[in-house]
């Protein structure tokens, strides 16, 4: 335990619920708890926390995001109208995911559970792709997806991750690629 407990946010509603702090904590001092509205926030166990600051370093909200200048911009849509109709992005995610899966990679994205919660899952078969298609207008649980992504990348697999900007930035920070 540390004399100075780490506080990630002054107001819990500043948190985007990406779970990066929980997944990076080597002491398992952080758990994500849900409020009455279903939003997830980190709770730090001061008995387990050693004050290393890993959670602060990986946080995409409490750190400045380096903005990059956009390069060339492309617009596209999937030619198959059935697939593009099931997608929110004109089918581009489906096209990219299909290619990654065909080449033996793994795809991560948000899917509804049987309880109609939304969580990030991984798929390895094209027939599972419809679960990831379409927008989900609620916060998704990341579970241990960042840990699995890191493991898959270390094993040399191609990984496609589809998420909202704060999740993508948190993943980059978690992987040390900011």
List the model feature ranges, each with a label.
Residues 66-178:
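Iron-sulfur-associated redox domains of electron-transfer enzymes in respiratory
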Residues 1-2, 20-43, 53-71:
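Iron-sulfur cluster-binding cysteine motifs and their immediate structural context
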Residues 47-48:
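Short, charged amphipathic alpha-helical surface segments
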Residues 5-8, 40-41, 80-82:
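A short, structure-level motif marking secondary-structure boundaries and short turns
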Residues 17, 51, 160-161:
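Conserved SAM-binding loop
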Residues 5-23, 95:
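N-terminal basic/disordered segments at the start of proteins
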Residues 6, 33-35, 152:
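Sterically constrained small-residue positions within well-ordered secondary structures
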